């Protein structure tokens, strides 16, 4: 969990690379409040989403699109590949993450069930060092976070430059 202007902030990366160039007004953006810490930031993010997005029959907000990137270890969002598989059924929309392997160690992540409920999920798997994680994710019985997302959804669009 870092402030939105920190170099490790996903919001900072997307804001500078996408939102600012496209002139998307800041009042149209809902960002994770990592600077408030994992529990408080996760609660606030869930409350904000529930105010603007309808829920499915299981109580999960139905987002139009979730765009994920693949980490070198096969993680997506901040869902670690070494988490117990039981986390796939956790109904938390957002939750705190502690001791994540890649800095920063404290994070806020969207939950598997919320990803599963989205109308569309797009995955970007690109770049050096991600080839093995990508192949492991596509293999039957894959153990990566991305493999878990694929098992939860009937369709996920994958954008990649990795030869399969």
Q: How should each PLM-predicted stretch be described?
A:
Residues 51-58, 110-113, 146-148:
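A generic local secondary-structure boundary/capping motif
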Residues 117-164:
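ATP/nucleoside-binding phosphotransfer catalytic cores, i.e., glycine-rich phosphate-binding loops
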Residues 1-65:
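Ligand-binding beta-strand-loop-alpha-helix segment within the catalytic cores
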Residues 66-113:
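Class I SAM-dependent methyltransferase SAM-binding "motif I" and its flanking Rossmann-like core
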Residues 42-43, 76-82, 133-137:
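A short secondary-structure junction signal
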Residues 32-33, 65-70, 123-126, 159:
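Short beta-strand segments
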Residues 22-23, 86-88, 113-118, 150-154:
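Short, conserved loop/helix-junction motifs that constitute active-site signature segments
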């Amino acid at each position: 969990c870092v402030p939105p202007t920190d170099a490790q902030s996903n919001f900072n990366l997307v804001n500078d690379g996408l939102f600012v160039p496209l002139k998307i007004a800041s009042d149209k953006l809902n960002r994770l409040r990592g600077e408030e810490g994992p529990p408080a930031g996760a609660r606030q993010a869930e409350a904000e989403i529930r105010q603007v997005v309808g829920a499915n029959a299981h109580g999960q907000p139905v987002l139009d699109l979730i765009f994920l990137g693949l980490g070198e270890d096969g993680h997506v969002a901040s869902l670690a590949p070494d988490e117990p598989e039981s986390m796939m059924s956790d109904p938390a929309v957002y939750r705190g993450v502690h001791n994540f392997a890649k800095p920063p160690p404290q994070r806020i992540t969207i939950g598997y069930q919320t990803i599963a409920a989205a109308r569309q999920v797009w995955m970007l798997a690109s770049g050096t060092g991600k080839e093995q994680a990508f192949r492991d994710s596509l293999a039957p019985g894959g153990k990566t976070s991305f493999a878990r997302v694929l098992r939860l959804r009937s369709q996920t669009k994958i954008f990649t430059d990795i030869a399969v």
